[in-house]
Amino acid sequence: MALPPSSPSPSSPSLQRLSTFKNPPPSSLSSGAPPPQTPSSSSSSPLDSFATDPILSPFLSSSFSSASFSSAALASGSPASTAERLHQAIRLLDSQLRNDVISRHPELLAQLSSLSHADVSLSSLRSSVSSLQSSIRRVRSDLSEPIKSIRSKSVQLSNLHTATELLSHSVRTLRLSKKLRDLADFPDPDKIDLTKAAQFHFEILTMCKEYDLFGIDVIDEEIKFVTEIGEKLRSEAMKVLERGMEGLNQAEVGTGLQVFYNLGELKSTVDQLVNKYKGMAVKSVSVAMDMKAITSGSGGGFGPGGIRSSGSPHIGGGAKVREALWQRMASCMEQLCSLVVAVWHLQRVLSKKRDPFTHVLLLDEVIKEGDSMLTDRVWDALVKAFTSQMKSAYTASSFVKEIFTMGYPKLVSMIENLLERISRDTDVKGVLPAINLERKEQMVACIAIFQTAFLSLCFGRLSDLVNSIFPMSSRGSLPSKEQISQVLSHIQDEIEAVHPDARLTLLVLREIGKALSNLAQRAECQISTGPETRQISGPATSTQIRNFTLCQHLQGIHTHISSMVADLPSIATDVLSPYLAAIYDAACEPVTPLFKAMRDKLESCILQIHDQNFGADDADMDNNASSYMEELQRSILHFRKEFLSRLLPSAANANTAGTESICTRLTRQMASRVLIFYIRHASLVRPLSEWGKLRMAKDMAELELAVGQNLFPVEQLGAPYRALRAFRPLVFLETSQMGSSPLINDLPPSIVLHHLYTRGPDELESPMQKNRLSPKQYSLWLDNQREDQIWKGIKATLDDYAVKIRSRGDKEFSPVYPLMLQIGSSLTQENL
């Protein structure tokens, strides 16, 4: 069944009207009166039930569609019930609307009354507005003529004021122009006050621009004159300024700057001047490196002495071109120094001079925040041009590369002299110098490519010499003295070539050090090893002689180079020290095994002292030395004859360089070791009779004689010799005298303590006896211990002795016991 077409449409407006009536009107809310209580307001609204009704709730939606609702109703299967439900809702809404109209009837009447009052007020307002408009028209008509008159008079007054101002400014301009003419017509042009004229010039042009005086005939005539005078002022001021910069005259520079400041052109003029000097610096560098100009001036064209397209001169012209290049470089350095100092002088005056009227610092007008200083601008351009020219010379011209590489010390000397002169000439208290350390390093870095090439060439020359005298291909061949002298002479030449330059000297010394390291490695490869090199029983073999010669060569190199660097600063010694140490170690290696073998031989002879009977009382003692001492003497004499005669320097050359030779040092150490080793084992001899003491004294005398005559002067050995001379009379002292004897001051405490065991009872065992060690084993242990550690071992034996005495119930100790404790306690106190 179809729904009535009119049923959905009235329902929606009815719902909307109902929602409007639910809220009170604004007038009633604003009056503050509570709304009247009606049955409809107290009861629930029909819309509340509609919201929960599945059929009526779609009508409350803002997106309600009648077509969709009708389709849904037809599809539900009960359209009749739906239509009936809608009719009920319409009746309910109509009833609700009637109730609302009835309940709000007084309010509706009040609204109608308000509308009537508003209409009356609006009619009265229209009448008032019409009257006001009529009055305005009458006033406008009355005031139009006076306003026109006022406007006309105002224009006339403004024109008069403008004409008066123009006339006033024109008169002032003409007066300034007359003053400027008076200055320009001064009889002596050199005495014209340029700064005052510049001030007049600036004021005239400023007034003309500011007050638009151009176009006035008399002013235009004066402007022509002012313009001409301005050009003359600029020209004269620039001459004064440049003359002052060249002559470093602060007064002239200040005058020139003041003129341009008064002209209002200070910054542009200074920038232009600095750019000019930058261009001059760049051009100076370019001209100095212009090989075409050099060759044309030193030999001409492509004739003899000319230059080929490759950059290499013809035969016969190289020397002239080289000399011309160096002359141009020297001239370039002079020009660069003058340019930089001139710009610095300009900057110096700018930083000190202030305008006498405004007190403005001129430097602040020229250099704004973030701008670089004038000298920095010129220096940066100079360094850039110099770097470019040097790179071009290195890559484009092999001839120039060779000149600057071979003559790098001269090149760097020129640059450092330039830097030193600039620093010296611009070192003024209270003024920034022209260049700082960073700027100097930039200039030196410009020729870094030639420095690298020069150092490589230096190392290459030295390496070639080293490789030629120590070829790896022919092991066993030794260089001659002439070849060694050639190497030393070449090293000295390399140092002398750069000696005036401390920085370059250190760099060359590092290259020399690399060459010395290479020499030490190659020399070590030539050292012969094996048992034959350590034999000391027969004459020196050819292998040993080769090692001796190699040692002497390396010793000579070490001594000679050490004397070279002695006159250099200490840092030079620090640079070469590790490389000289490598040479020294290489020089020691051929002979150290020989001296060690000889020392072992002499120690084995001395150890035979323990096989002798020094405890016997033999009245028939002969005057001969002990057999072990005779063997030791023969060994020393043989070593002297066969080996030391070849190794030790002659008396004329013994102290040429003021340093001890390697073999002399090894011989001295061996002699000291023999003396100390002997008195150590002599102190361990037990028992020792009076006859044994005499025999031991005889042996010590023979030892002193053998060492002094064949090894090293014993009086130059120091402590070992004093110990030997003290031990000989010590053995003859009474035990009671030893504690106060000054002899023990020249002996190691362990020697005295070991000797006291000889004077003690048998039950007082020495550490060697207690630990059942052989003399050689005990001696090796002593070599690795300090005196306080040796005392600990001795103290343990003394404690054992005291325990034995106390265990027997004895109260008396051997006289040596308290004496040994006294010596040991003093040793302990010294180490605290």
UniProtKB/Swiss-Prot annotation:
It is found in: Golgi apparatus membrane. One of its GO terms (biological process) is intra-Golgi vesicle-mediated transport. Residues 1-11, 23-38 have a biased composition (Pro residues). One of its GO terms (molecular function) is protein homodimerization activity. Its main location: Golgi. Required for normal Golgi function. Belongs to the COG5 family. This is Conserved oligomeric Golgi complex subunit 5. The lineage of its organism: Eukaryota, Viridiplantae, Streptophyta, Embryophyta, Tracheophyta. The gene is COG5.
